[in-house]
Structure formats: structure tokens, C-alpha cells
Amino acid sequence: MPKPNAVSLGPMLDPELVTRARGALLGLVAGNQLGVPTEHLGTPAAIRAAYPDGVRDPATPPKASPYDDDAAMTLLLAESLAEQGDFDAADAAQRWVRWMKADGRGIGVLTRRALKLVERGVEPFEAGRRALAEAPQSAAGNGAVMRCVPVALRFHDNPDRLIRVATQQAAIPFDYVVSGSYSLKITVK
């Protein structure tokens, strides 16, 4: 249920905008799934070495786990933004915690640490700061960039809010300035 002061995404939405939003999220998930087989190989040379003829038969994801962490967390953020009408860090983080407990496919070390802290009652942004402080060598962060899609869709008409939320959503799993910077840069473009 939307908060009283939240902007509703209800019936006033332009149907064409809804169709475009669905298309953007579908394209994001499809592209992500196609990239999963090469995700941890690192360089183009490593990918060519592992797949000299290209990826011909991407691994089928497990039935119980259709999405990896980046896609799942992006879709859950989109769901939170749609249902809450605005960015609610606690709501998004709790959705991610439930997903982690039920599935958690592909979740990174820092994201898991931060979400476990959230599960224990730590405020989401503080959880991100603590997770990064405990294991700074584990910082990665392309998921923050993927999650810019629902942020841009929701706040396309409010650049100030778009910039703020793009940075905030990146800080929850782990407060890594590079993730926030890249997510902000890509969202604004």
C-alpha cells in the first residue's frame, strides 16, 4: 500500500509508458541472462579462450532460480518502486532479504553480508557501509548499474530525485562509491 505522501503509479500512468517500461525490464533481464555464462571470466581474451566459437548453448537456469542476483534485485526494486510510489530503502532491502533467503542465486559476498545485517535489523544504508568496511576487497558492483533501469523509469520526470535514488539504491547492498558513481552516470545519460 502506498504511503500517504508517496506519488502513486496508479491509473494515471500513460499506457505507452507502461509498455516501454515492461520492454526495458524484459530487455534488461534477457541481456543479463545471455551474459551469465561469461560473467566471471573477466576479459574478452578469457571469454574467447573459454568459448572459441562463441557461447552456443547458454546454461539453462535452475527452475527454482530463473534469475541471477542482478536481474532478481532489479525486478524487486522495480516492484518496490511501483508498489510504494517512491523509493523506500527499507522496503527494497526487505524484498532483497526475502529473495536471498528463498533463492539468492549468484549473490555476492558483500551483498549477502549487507542483507544479513538488514535481516538482523540494521538500517539498510548502515548495513551497506558495514559490509564494505568488513570486506573492501570484495567490492564489485555492476548490479547497481542494472538497477538504474527501474529508477530511470520511475523518476524520468524528476532529475533531482532520479540522481538521488540512483545513488541511494547502489548504497544498500554495499556502500561502494564506484557503484554509486557509475549508476548515477548511466542513469543520467
Residues of each region from the PLM?
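Structured, active/binding-site neighborhoods that engage oxygen-rich ligands
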Residues: 2-189
